[in-house]
Design a protein with these regions (language model features):
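Small-residue-enriched, tightly packed secondary-structure blocks
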Residues: 21-178
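Bacterial N-terminal signal peptides
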Residues: 6-15
Length: 178
């Protein structure tokens, strides 16, 4: 009986509405978006992109073998439409750890659709434009995507966004009212 109660309690906790966490993630994404707006030239992308994914915090670390991951929010028409998970694994010369924020701009409906249908990843040649305090960065679209990043903390002896894979989760029900 005790194990049945434990399973029931964990089941209820696991099935609680996820949108409470989604609300916090959306708030974090909107705050980071404002920081990017004041630190660099992203406004041109905000007005022309079919959509954009904002990852407030991506943690990355490695010692020859490395990995990175984080959660973000997809915006279409300036409104949050779902969450996304990013994962990246790499092998090669790398040492250290860092956290950073990332925004991926989708130039056209085709690349946005690929992202929403989980057919999107940044290839090995993908590069990001780093935005730092007080400096402006000029990013451009490549293959329908522009990526900008901003380091939050840490130092990493390797900096690529290639190989990032994404999984999109649309908001449903009351969570869709963000």
């Amino acid at each position: 009986m005790r194990s049945f109660m434990t399973v029931t309690v964990f089941g209820l906790l696991a099935s609680s509405p996820a949108f409470a966490n989604d609300d916090a993630l959306v708030a974090d994404a909107q705050a980071i978006l404002q920081t990017f707006k004041t630190q660099g030239k992203i406004n041109k992308f905000l007005t022309t992109a079919s959509g954009y994914a904002v990852f407030p915090t991506i943690a990355k670390g490695g010692l020859i073998v490395g990995g990175a991951g984080g959660d973000g929010v997809l915006f279409v028409g300036g409104k949050p439409v779902g969450t996304a998970n990013m994962g990246q694994a790499s092998i090669g010369l790398q040492l250290g750890g860092q956290t950073y924020s990332e925004i991926i701009f989708f130039e056209n409906p085709s690349t946005l659709s690929d992202f929403k249908n989980n057919h999107f990843q940044l290839d090995a040649q993908a590069t990001a434009v780093a935005i730092s305090a007080g400096a402006s960065a000029d990013a451009n679209y490549t293959r329908g995507v522009a990526v900008v990043t901003m380091t939050k903390a840490g130092l990493m002896g390797e900096a690529s966004v290639g190989g990032q894979k994404f999984t999109f989760h649309p908001f449903t029900g009351s969570a869709a009212k963000h």
